[in-house]
């Protein structure tokens, strides 16, 4: 626990005894505690334990330890803090803790809202379930409160992903075994067939109710006609009966519909979740060759967009399934109404069908291409923002923005084609009902010379039924096409080869091992017999021609490689004919060799990651702990990273912290080991990340430890501590495989494996037997031989440990942790409250062009008006015949339309009817009817084209704004925002804007304008209906208002719960080798399931709210229909027959249109949540200063560094820097000058400020005060690109990007091929490139993840050589290379940059002792800055102390290198 205030007499902390982890103790650092007046806080100390192998003494149980005037106190949490007493404490209040992940995790805190309760739906009775009454109190709660995730009830047991997976996996495994072409959906139907069937039954009953409605509409119209003809022959109450039957029928239909919707949504979400889970599990098992075919971005796309396609399909699957039956039944009933003219409708649909099918097939083709380009875009985004710091340091923003825009441009090109085909299909199907109406009624009139009202309006009702499936058919077919492509991609991924690492239960890795070998090799150990392992990579397409002159083309040289995945996988690096056997406890196998020899590959071969190429065998028996060269860190607390799912054991935990030298680090953290490390360990230095990874391995208490160059990321002193206290200490009884460049530890090995360039084993023997013949391992290199012999003699020196553990890399943590007083680095994801703001709608409207949107909106209004006017004209036409045939004497009072709106009738036409009842000007009437229909179709075409153009512009502009906003964000933004959260904007949110938002907006505008038109028609036809409709409309408003306040909150939470799924997935992909080595795949699958369940409970709650709303709106719509029928029955003697049919037909469709309009509004709001999230980033993310300031650009040749004006080239003047405003300074008034050509070495104690100095120079962090001057220019006054492009850095953690070797060396295409080859020769990668090139790829060799860290650092050096900078920064540039390569790099830097200013930060003092001056930093200030010879002679110098700490012989060697 953390106790921030120990000075309060009344402090009282209650602990939960049920917390399993609270059984241990908490280690708290008490510094300078004020004891005055605090007699109750007295802590007794006892049981001191000293560890001779380490300078860090700690006390067990209630003990204490002094170090640097700090006291470490162990508290037993079962005792109250007030019962402790502090002895000899100093006056300081900072503290740190370890041992308790969450002190209040298991406390029975009261749950707010419905949190922790069983699902309300699961507990609902039959009536409540059918009518969604159970959701009423939840809607009311959301209306009054701001909803939080923990206030939503628990997910129902039958919706939990683990339960669903168990059901599905049986059928999927059978499908894989028994089918040549496994069908995921077939397995899904077997698993959830009853749910599909139940949904179809409910929807089918709803469809039946839809067809019953027009039947009773016809009966009501007939009732009025018969009553008018002969009142005595008809029961006057018959109209009320029909009205009641119509109401009950509509109510039952609504109940069935919304039950069907909920079942379908639940089933679709289940399958979507299963796809996400299957993709996640599969990504944990892919072989290297399979993995090389799929980038992280492509796999993320499967989880986000492809899984979503299935969910979208299920939202309209019932409409799609019943579309054809509904059309067929409608045609039969239509034939019953109008006779053979109904075949005109069939003919029109038959003609349009081939066109629709053709468009559908084109949609499928373009969707497949579009998905491929989407994968490429996401791949670039993922890679960019994972390496954003490198991109900023190299000033590569423009290059990567062009690369990104190129990918997005290709995606938009196919998106445009896709949307064009989709909208052309929409135009056809939306126009078909109008075209059918024109032709059918025209033919009917020409044949029968009349239009009977009862038949015509029944026909109109059936056409309205047809209109719904026809309207949704293009959307549904479009989604089906996308789904078909997506499910094909998912199945292809699930069918990829899986790695076979042996028996998880028995902790074995078996590769090509026979039963006899298993019987012989039963002891814990490593048994490798004549194996040749290889990596597999994707070959490149035909390489471009070589460059003889620098290219002006700044686009990505690897931009046109979208077809690469179709190529066969070819072998790159291989580890040849390797044999070894390690089975004795306490064995230490050391693997050494030059850069690129295969040390890391050997480690991964032992893990079963490489592919066996011959008949050899590998068997690893026992549990394995693995530490990679680049430490993999989880986004969790430091403690969670160490425990890694194992039970907390206080004694071992303390021992691990001690031997991994982590105790001093905990002193820097406000929350000790509870500190949140951050994504990719961003909150820790390289050395700290490595030590946390080592601590994780040590705590696991495994049988075999595979350690890949773990000492490179720490300084020599900490390296010694780790070697003697971990490898030769706590792990002395374990089998350890250590790949290393630290040759001074070779004498301690029991076996040594020497690899040479190309992956061949040079020697495998004891170190003593090897030392005499070592020269041959490196081509008889006398330099390497001398170094190895020197290290062998120095090894004895290393036994001595000092009283201090000083990790130079620890600085970063202290600097970063000024940012972390609460121990939290990752920010909480932003979330707006209330309904979607109007400004977000305007954001979307203006993005596509406000004028275009207004034209489209006007098109919807006019289109709906003309469509409605067509039916009104039809009703007016039929009324002339009906009125003539019934009672000409009542004509003056029978037409309510004329009486209520005579100005409309008078202005439209003046119809003369002859004695036979024929319309004299029928030709004019027919001509107007056709003209209106044609105008309606033309308007549909025009507004669709305009809307299409608008949507493409909008999505293009929004993505551009998002990309540039994040690219220009300061570095702290990426340190505090998880990558998964950023990726979510570029995947799911962008996909919604690209594909779904325009659909929702289109349909909302369509249905809402329909509702307005219907209300206008009803008010004209039956104006007395407006009075009872008013309270219904008011009630309608409040219901939808309550709903929207609920739905938008749930949608926002759903979006937020989606981000951790992506973050966890990205984290898993980066650490999959570590997870497999520790056999932690199962635990991470459980975590994935938990994250899915959180997201699913939000989604299903949202869907339940949708059905709640829909049913209640249906009730209101059905009430309007009931009232309309009642009023018609009451006014049966005077109402116009045309008004009867028009009013009822439109009230019937009003229910559907109101529901659809409100649902689409809700859907639009949920989709607009993506606009909210994107606009938040585009409008609220802080931006870096301008890349270029035209008014203050540096002169050509800047910086010249010629000293022409007699001023130092680099001047720091009173530099003060904080990571953010309001945080403590990490650089405190630093001032110094650097002369032209000077070589400056920078070192210092923990938290000294070295990294901060570097960040200030590159303006990664802006200064709080002071200034930095380079060659006479204040760098804060010039653009970032102008500054950073003139500096060069060789980073500690080098990055190679997807693409070619050429693009990685010369991203800006500024150099010729010959220059690039020359650099490769200088950094000694020329032969390696020639060897691994396929088909003479050369510089166009495609790079992959199999390049070693050392090789990547050499590429970083190559970039600097090509750039020829005036100022070079080396940030531990030789950390991951062997001694020979270290010497090579140092020699190249000395020779090639002899005139440049060089700033070198290093753990290894040998890399800086030959500098002109040494700068020693401490606590953000310069404490020493002088020549190394002067500092080394000063006994009180910190630099002199650091030299002495390397050991007697090594310190003598270092002093011999110092210039005098």
Curated annotation (Swiss-Prot):
Q: Which residues form the ABC transporter domain?
A: 560-783, 1210-1444
Q: Which UniProt keywords apply?
A: ATP-binding, Membrane, Nucleotide-binding, Repeat, Transmembrane, Transmembrane helix, Transport
UniProt lists compositionally biased (Low complexity) regions at: 37-55
The cross-references to Pfam families, in alphabetical order and at most eight, read:
ABC_membrane, ABC_tran
List the Gene3D superfamilies: ABC transporter type 1, transmembrane domain, P-loop containing nucleotide triphosphate hydrolases
Q: Which GO terms describe its molecular function?
A: ABC-type transporter activity; ATP binding; ATP hydrolysis activity; ATPase-coupled transmembrane transporter activity
Q: Choose one Gene Ontology CC annotation of this protein and give it.
A: membrane
Any stretches that span the bilayer, and where are they?
A: 196-216, 238-258, 320-340, 425-445, 456-476, 842-862, 922-942, 1014-1034, 1108-1128
- Give the residues the record marks as binding ATP: 593-600, 1244-1251
Recorded hits in InterPro entries, A to Z, give: AAA+_ATPase, ABC1_TM_dom, ABC1_TM_sf, ABC_transporter-like_ATP-bd, ABC_transporter-like_CS, ABC_transporter_C-like, ABCC_6TM_D1, P-loop_NTPase
Q: Which domain of life is it from?
A: Eukaryota
**One of the GO BP terms on file:** sorocarp development
Q: Which family does it belong to?
A: Belongs to the ABC transporter superfamily. ABCC family. Conjugate transporter (TC 3.A.1.208) subfamily.
Q: What is this protein called?
A: ABC transporter C family member 5
Protein's gene: abcC5
């Amino acid at each position: 626990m953390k106790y921030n205030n120990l000075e309060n007499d009344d402090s009282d902390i209650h602990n939960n005894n049920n917390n399993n982890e609270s059984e241990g103790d908490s280690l708290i650092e008490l510094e300078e505690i004020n004891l005055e007046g605090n007699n109750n806080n007295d802590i007794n100390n006892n049981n001191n334990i000293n560890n001779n192998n380490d300078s860090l003494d700690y006390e067990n149980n209630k003990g204490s330890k002094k170090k640097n005037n700090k006291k470490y106190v162990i508290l037993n949490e079962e005792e109250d803090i007030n019962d402790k007493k502090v002895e000899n404490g100093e006056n300081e209040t900072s503290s740190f803790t370890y041992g308790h992940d969450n002190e209040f995790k298991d406390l029975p805190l009261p749950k707010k809202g419905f949190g922790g309760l069983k699902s309300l739906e699961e507990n609902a009775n039959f009536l409540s379930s059918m009518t969604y009454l159970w959701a009423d109190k939840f809607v009311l709660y959301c209306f009054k409160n701001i909803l939080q995730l923990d206030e939503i009830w628990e997910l129902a047991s039958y919706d939990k992903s683990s339960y669903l997976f168990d059901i599905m996996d049986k059928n999927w495994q059978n499908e894989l075994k028994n089918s040549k072409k496994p069908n995921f959906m077939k397995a899904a139907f077997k698993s959830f067939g009853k749910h599909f069937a139940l949904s179809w039954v409910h929807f089918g009953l709803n469809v039946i109710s839809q067809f019953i409605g027009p039947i009773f509409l016809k009966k009501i119209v007939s009732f009025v006609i018969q009553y008018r003809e002969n009142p005595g022959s008809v029961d006057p109450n018959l109209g009320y009966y029909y009205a009641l039957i119509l109401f009950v029928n509509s109510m039952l239909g609504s109940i069935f519909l919304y039950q069907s919707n909920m079942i379908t949504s639940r089933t679709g979400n289940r399958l979507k979740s299963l796809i996400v889970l299957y993709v996640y599990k599969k990504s944990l098992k892919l072989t290297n060759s399979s993995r090389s075919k799929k980038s992280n971005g492509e796999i993320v796309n499967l989880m986000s967009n492809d899984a979503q396609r299935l969910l979208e399909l299920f939202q309209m699957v019932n409409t799609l399934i019943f579309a054809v039956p509904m059309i067929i039944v409608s045609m039969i009933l239509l034939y019953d109404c109008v006779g053979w003219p109904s075949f005109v409708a069939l003919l029109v649909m038959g003609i349009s069908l081939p066109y629709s099918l053709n468009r559908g097939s084109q949609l499928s083709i373009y969707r497949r291409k579009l998905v491929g380009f989407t994968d490429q875009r996401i791949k670039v985004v993922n890679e960019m923002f994972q390496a954003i710091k490198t991109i900023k340091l190299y000033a590569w923003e423009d290059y990567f923005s062009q690369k990104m825009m190129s990918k997005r441009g290709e995606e938009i090109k196919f998106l445009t084609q896709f949307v064009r085909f989709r909208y052309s299909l929409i135009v056809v199907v939306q126009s078909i009902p109008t075209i059918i109406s024109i032709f059918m009624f025209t033919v009917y009139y020409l044949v029968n010379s009349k239009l009977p009202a009862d038949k015509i309006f029944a026909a109109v009702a059936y056409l309205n039924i047809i209109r719904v499936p026809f309207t949704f058919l293009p959307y549904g077919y479009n989604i089906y096409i996308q789904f078909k492509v997506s499910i094909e991609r998912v199945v292809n991924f699930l069918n990829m080869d899986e790695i076979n690492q042996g028996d998880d239960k028995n902790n074995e890795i078996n590769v090509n091992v026979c039963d006899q070998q298993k019987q012989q090799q039963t002891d814990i150990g490593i048994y490798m017999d004549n194996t040749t392992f290889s990596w597999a990579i994707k070959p490149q397409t035909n390489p471009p021609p070589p460059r003889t002159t620098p290219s002006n083309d700044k686009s990505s040289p690897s931009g046109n490689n979208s077809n690469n995945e179709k190529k066969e996988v070819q072998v790159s690096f291989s580890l040849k004919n390797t044999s070894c056997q390690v089975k004795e406890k306490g064995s230490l196998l050391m693997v050494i060799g030059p850069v690129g020899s295969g040390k890391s590959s050997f480690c991964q071969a032992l893990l079963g990651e490489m592919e066996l190429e011959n008949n050899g065998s590998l068997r690893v028996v026992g549990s394995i702990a693995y530490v990679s060269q680049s430490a993999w860190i989880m986004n969790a607390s430091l403690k969670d990273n160490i425990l890694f799912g194992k039970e907390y054991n206080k004694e071992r935990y303390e021992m691990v912290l001690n031997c991994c030298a982590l105790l001093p680090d905990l002193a820097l953290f406000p929350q000790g080991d509870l500190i949140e490390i951050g994504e990719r360990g961003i909150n820790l230095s390289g050395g700290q990340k490595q030590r946390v990874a080592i601590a994780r391995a040590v705590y696991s208490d495994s049988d075999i430890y595979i350690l890949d160059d773990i000492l490179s990321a720490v300084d020599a002193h900490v390296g010694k501590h780790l070697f003697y206290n971990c490898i030769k200490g706590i792990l002395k009884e374990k089998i350890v495989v250590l790949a290393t460049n630290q040759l001074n530890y070779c004498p301690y090995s029991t076996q040594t494996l020497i690899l040479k360039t190309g992956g061949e084993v040079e020697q495998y023997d004891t170190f003593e037997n090897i030392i005499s013949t070592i020269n041959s391992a490196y081509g008889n290199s006398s330099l390497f031989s001398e170094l190895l012999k020197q290290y062998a003699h120095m090894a004895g020196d290393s036994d001595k440990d000092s009283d201090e553990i000083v990790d130079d890399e620890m600085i970063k943590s202290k600097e970063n942790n000024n940012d972390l007083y609460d121990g939290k680095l990752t920010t909480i994801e932003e979330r707006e409250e209330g309904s979607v703001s109007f400004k977000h709608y305007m954001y979307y409207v203006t993005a596509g062009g406000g004028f275009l949107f207004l034209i489209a909106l006007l098109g919807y209004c006019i289109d709906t008006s003309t469509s409605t006017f067509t039916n009104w004209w039809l009703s007016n036409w039929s009324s002339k015949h009906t009125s003539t045939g019934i009672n000409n004497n009542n004509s003056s009072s029978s037409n309510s339309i004329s009486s209520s709106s005579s100005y409309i009738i008078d202005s439209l036409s003046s119809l003369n009817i002859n004695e036979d009842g024929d319309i004299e000007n029928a030709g004019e009437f027919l001509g107007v009817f056709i003209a209106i229909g044609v105008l309606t179709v033309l308007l549909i075409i025009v507004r669709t084209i305009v809307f299409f153009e608008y949507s493409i512009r909008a999505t293009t502009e929004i993505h551009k704004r998002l990309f540039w906003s994040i690219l220009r964000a300061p570095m702290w933004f990426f340190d505090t925002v998880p990558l998964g959260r950023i990726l979510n904007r570029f995947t799911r949110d962008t996909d919604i804007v690209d594909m779904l938002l325009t659909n929702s907006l289109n349909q909302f505008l369509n249905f809402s304008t329909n509702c307005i038109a219907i209300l206008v028609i009803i008010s004209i036809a039956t104006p007395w209906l407006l009075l009872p409709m008013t309270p219904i409309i008011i009630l309608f408003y409040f219901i939808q208002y309550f709903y929207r306040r609920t739905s938008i909150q749930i949608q926002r939470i759903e979006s937020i719960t989606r981000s951790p799924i992506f973050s966890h997935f990205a984290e898993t992909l980066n650490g999959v080798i570590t997870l497999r080595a520790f056999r932690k795949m199962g635990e991470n699958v459980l975590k994935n399931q938990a994250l899915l369940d959180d997201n699913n409970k939000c989604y299903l709650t949202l869907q339940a709210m949708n059905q709640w709303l829909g049913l209640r709106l249906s009730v209101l719509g059905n009430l309007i229909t009931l009232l309309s029928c009642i009023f018609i029955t009451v006014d049966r003697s005077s109402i116009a027959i045309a008004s009867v049919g028009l009013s009822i037909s439109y009230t019937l469709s009003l229910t559907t249109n109101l529901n659809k309009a409100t649902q689409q509004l809700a859907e639009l709001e949920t989709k607009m949540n993506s606009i909210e999230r994107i606009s938040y980033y585009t409008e609220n993310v802080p931006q870096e200063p301008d890349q270029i300031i035209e008014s203050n650009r540096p002169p050509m040749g800047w910086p010249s560094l010629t000293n022409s004006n007699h001023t130092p080239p680099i001047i720091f003047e009173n530099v003060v820097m904080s990571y953010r405003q309001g945080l403590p300074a990490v650089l405190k008034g630093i001032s110094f000058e650097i002369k032209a050509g000077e070589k400056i070495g920078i070192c210092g104690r923990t938290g000294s400020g070295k990294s901060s100095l570097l960040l200030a120079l590159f303006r990664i962090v802006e200064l709080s005060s002071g200034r930095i001057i380079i060659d006479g220019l204040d760098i804060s006054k010039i653009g970032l690109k102008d500054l950073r492009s003139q500096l060069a850095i060789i980073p500690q953690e080098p990055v190679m990007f997807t693409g070619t070797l050429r693009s990685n060396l010369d991203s800006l295409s500024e150099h010729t091929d010959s220059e690039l080859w020359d650099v490769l020769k200088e950094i000694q990668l020329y032969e390696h490139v020639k060897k691994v090139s396929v088909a003479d790829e050369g510089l166009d060799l495609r790079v992959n993840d199999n390049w070693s860290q050392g090789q990547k650092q050499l590429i970083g050096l190559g970039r600097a050589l090509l750039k020829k900078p005036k100022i070079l920064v080396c940030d531990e540039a030789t950390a991951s290379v062997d001694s020979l390569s270290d010497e090579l790099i140092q020699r190249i830097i000395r020779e090639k940059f002899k005139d440049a200013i060089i700033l070198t930060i290093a753990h290894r003092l040998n890399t800086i002792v030959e500098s002109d001056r040494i700068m020693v930093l401490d606590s953000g200030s310069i404490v020493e800055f002088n020549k190394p010879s002067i500092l080394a002679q000063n006994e009180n110098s910190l630099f002199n102390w650091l030299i002495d700490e390397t050991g007697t012989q090594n310190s003598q060697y270092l002093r011999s290198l110092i210039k005098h």
